[in-house]
Structure formats: structure tokens, C-alpha cells
Amino acid sequence: MKKILFLSLFLMVCTILSAQKRVKVACVGNSITYGYTLPNPATDSYPSQLQQLLGETYEVGNFGKSGATLLNKGHRPYMQQEEFKKAIAFAGDIVVIHLGINDTDPRDWPNYRDSFVKDYLALIDSFRVANPKCHIIIARLTPIADRHPRFESGTRDWHGEIQQSIETIAKYAGVQLMDFHEPLYPYPYLLPDAVHPNVEGAGILAKTVYSAITGDFGGLHLSELYTDNMVLQHGEPLAIRGKANAGEKVTVSIAKQKLTAKAASNGDWAVTIQPLKAGGPYTLTVSAGKQKQTFNNVLAGEVWLCSGQSNMEFYLSWSKTAKRDIPQAANDQIRLFDMKARWRTDAVEWDTSVLDSLNHLQYYKDTEWTVCS
């Protein structure tokens, strides 16, 4: 009996300690944070999806208020809402703020724009008072699509002005800046009503916040343009850039040059190599942590970008002199990165799978640099 009682008490203490160790994340915002227009905000909103990504060691609170403005003289000031009071009481260890979309309303920004920075700083200070050790992340605004009824009557321009203000606030307040705009901007279908993300869009926001909190950006990543047989521009300083987990040391080596960089809080890193002498072949290596990517048979030379219409796709094998010309084409000093369309733009109906791929910007087939032959 004593053993059972001791075990029960032990498990109870472990449970309490476990609960105390959970990192609290307060998601502060408007209807986009709340999950307005989603089938089930309780499971589909970005804070709910963020909870799934972070796991049981985190507790994510959704304090989104539909229609809320950042401006304290706006038509629905966030700091006057019940959600704000609950967010303060929550005293999050991490506070994620996405406000400003509703401030593009003609009732707000034209009249009270000069108070935006002051009011945002006051909001930040409120959370710092509630938890002096909290880490605050503020987000650049999600896009507003051109289908919005007020897009060309001020909303587009005011949206841009607010973005600039948010960037200024991040620097002045010493808080982490996160981008909610770039991940959604290329995909209009993610914003069915021009403002609110669908479930997939909310998932992208959740992943963005997850990376901002954990620094996990999926490890070392470079553009698809980096492959074996590639050509780098010779004779001038050249930037090599990519993604890595935040804070990770990245090392780039080529032609007896070895450069290092530290991935920023958004995962971006870049180094600038000194001008390469024309020729090669060179070997380019990029490493971060336990990951390493090696690109062989790299040349330094002239890089030409060619784009155009159907005549750019004309195959040499289609020409009348193909049999004579093709044998003369072999030249290992010439390389081609040929991006071929996945689907023809002929007068045919595409099925839904094609439309889905196009919506995800999958226009071209996977390719790599090849040696001319």
C-alpha cells in the first residue's frame, strides 16, 4: 500500500513539474490569428497547427481578435479587447504578434498613422511587464491580394507603409522580426477572400512561427541552380547564399578560398567569394553542422540568361542541318541549365492535378546543369 501511495505521489510530482516546464507561446493578433473563415479554428488556425508542430513541451495560446487594430484610436483597438487581457494574464514566455492588417482601414491609418509606432511599443512593453523574461517576435504583415475591394483606393499603399513601420519597430524595440508576407505572397489561392489564409496558408504561417521559435529551417539548403557542372560568373565578386538552421556556422570552399558565415535568425546566410579566374574545373563545397553539399566539375566563365517564346525551345534535331550540326556541338566548356515546362500551353483543358501544381508554382521540370554534347 505504501509503495502504491509513494508511486502515485511520485507520478503526481512528475506531472506537476512537467507542466511547469512547458514553454508558453502567446499568439496575439486579429482574425488571421483567430482562424476566421477556417472550417474549425480550434484545429485549423495557425496557433493550433503550431501547437502540433512544437509538441507537448510547449503550450500555445490563441489570443486573436477579429477586426482588431494595433492603433489605440482605431476602430477596434486590440489593447481594449478581452483577448488582450487574457494574453497578459497568460504571461507567455514567447509572444508572437501579428497586427496591422485592419489598420489599413480608411478610418484608421490616414488619421492615426503617426501613433502606430508608439502604440506598438506600448503593446510590446505590456507583455514585458507581464513577463520580463519573455521573448517577443513581431511579424511583417500577411499579404492583401489585389481582389480586395479597397486595394487600389489606399489599402495597398498603406499596407506597405505599415510594413516599413513594423521593421522600424523591430529594430527600435530589440525584438525578433519574422516575415508573414513572403511565404504567402506567391500563392494567391491561399487567400480565398484576399485577406484570410485557408487551412494550407495557416499551416505555412505555423511553420514560419515554428522556425522563428526553434531556429529549425530544415538544415542546409541551396537553390536548385547549384548542381554539378554549373557555371559561375568569372572576374567579379560573387555571392553564394542559401538557408541553414539559425545560428549555424556555414563554410564555403572553392579555388583555395574558404569563407564562413553565420545563419541569421531567419535562416539566411551569404558569403562573397573573390573573383574566380576563368576556367576550371573547380569543386564547390558548402557545409553546415553535419551536412555537406559538394558540387563537382564547376567552371568559371560567362553566364548568359536566355528567355523568350517558342523559338527558344527549338531543338537542333528539328533543323534541316541537324545531322551535320549535332556532331559538331560537343564542347565540354559549354554548359546548359535548361528549364523545360511541365505542361504545354496549348488549347487543351488541364485537369485539377495540373491546376494544383501550377498553383504551387511547379511550372518547370526538375533539371540540372549539363555538359554540351
Label each PLM-derived region with a short phrase.
Residues 1-21:
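Bacterial Sec-dependent N-terminal signal peptides
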Residues 217-222:
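Proline/serine/threonine-rich low-complexity linkers at boundaries of modular beta-sandwich domains
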Residues 241-321:
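Extended acidic/polar, glycine-enriched regions
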Residues 327-344, 348-361:
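C-terminal catalytic domains of large/alpha subunits in multi-subunit enzymes
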Residues 228, 236-240:
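Structural beta-strand segments of beta-rich domains
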Residues 21-27, 32-121, 157, 276, ...:
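Conserved SGNH/GDSL esterase-like catalytic core that processes O-acyl groups on lipids
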Residues 357-373:
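A conserved hydrophobic secondary-structure block that centers on an alpha-helix together
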Residues 20-21, 52, 78-216:
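Alpha-helical cap/lid subdomain in secreted, periplasmic
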